Structures are given as structure tokens and as C-alpha cells.
Amino acid sequence: PLNCLIDLRDDGCKLHAGSQFQTIDQAAVAKVLGLKPEQVEFHTMMAGGGFGRRAVPSSDYLAEAAQIAKAWRASGAKGPLKVVWSREDDIRGGYYRPMHLHRAEIGFDAEGKVLGWKHTIVGQSIITGTPFEAFMVKDGVDASMTEGIVDTPYALPVHLEVHHPTLNVPVLWWRSVGHTHTAFVMETLVDEIARASGQDPVAYRRALLGDK
């Protein structure tokens, strides 16, 4: 479960947590406590299965721990506190893997040569609203959602359209990112073209790769 040990003292704070975002988490805790980042002594513990859940731009459970520690200290109490999110807490306050819809219209000849490939993806952005938006979202397109298609190693004339709907479901990254859905779609479609043109799928892929 998400958890940490926090000890707020007169001269700073000690924090023990399995973090994947130490610098951001340290700064978030410092901000809540009114400290400088260097006053937060961060001890990184073994994270177990982090899978990106312990790399949250909002530093959610650690910021919460800092708020609790601040109130605990203000009440006159001293000593370390351990904060643990239950499974119910995590489901209620966590983030979800966004759903994606792919639609492709492909034109190819009898030999399997692709003449046109129109590809549309619809899905929530996991980068918009995070500190990474400035360099990972260009012209309104989340780069993490198009990887595996815009940079496909296959010689394909792909025309890609992306739509990011705004929904109230909180989403963020998961184990791996865009390739988890784009690779499945691309490879499935390549298989379909190979089968429709009567070619061995491996040989067809080798032809699409050219000299790569």
C-alpha cells in the first residue's frame, strides 16, 4: 500500500517513503510544511511494485502526510507518524488508466502495399496538467499517447489524428505508456493486411522494415 513515515522537527523533516519522484515529492512536502526542500531529509525505501503509482506530480499521499504532520505538531505532539492508504483509499483517491479508442482506415493493393492509412485515437491525456506538459504536449497532442504510431519502424504512410476528451475521471500513467495500446493495434492491423494479401506475417514485417 501507499505509505510513508514522516517526522517533523523544529529544524526540518525526515521522510521515509518508497518514491519514484524524489525531487518532486521533496519539494511538495517542503511546500506544505513551509520549509526549504533541503530541510526535508528524504530516505528512499524499497518501493515494491511501484509501476508509476509512486511517481505522481501532485505527490498526493506524501502531501497528505505532511498536512497531518503539520497539524500533529501544531497540537503540541511530537514524534514520527506513519501514514498508510488502505486499498479503499487508493481506489477512491488514486488515478486510473485512460481508455483509448483506435479507428483505422487502410487502403492496400493485392500485394499488401499500403497506399493510405488514416488512424484516429481518442483518449484522455495523462500529461496535460502536470509539470511535463510544457515539453510533452505539442499543439494540444499528448506525445505519450502517439508513441508507437508516429515513430513506427514500418514504412507506412500513416496520417494520425488525436482527440483528447475532457472528462472527470482522474487519469495518469500506468505500467508503460503509449506502446501498451498502440503496439497492439499496429501489430494487429499489420497481421490483418498480411493475411488479406496472402503473405507470411513475419516476411511481410521484414519487408515493411526495409533496411532497418
Region spans (language model):
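Alpha-helical support elements that line or immediately flank enzyme active sites
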Residues: 4-75, 134-148, 173-212
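A residue-level signal for beta-strand positions that form part of recognition/binding surfaces
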Residues: 12, 80, 153
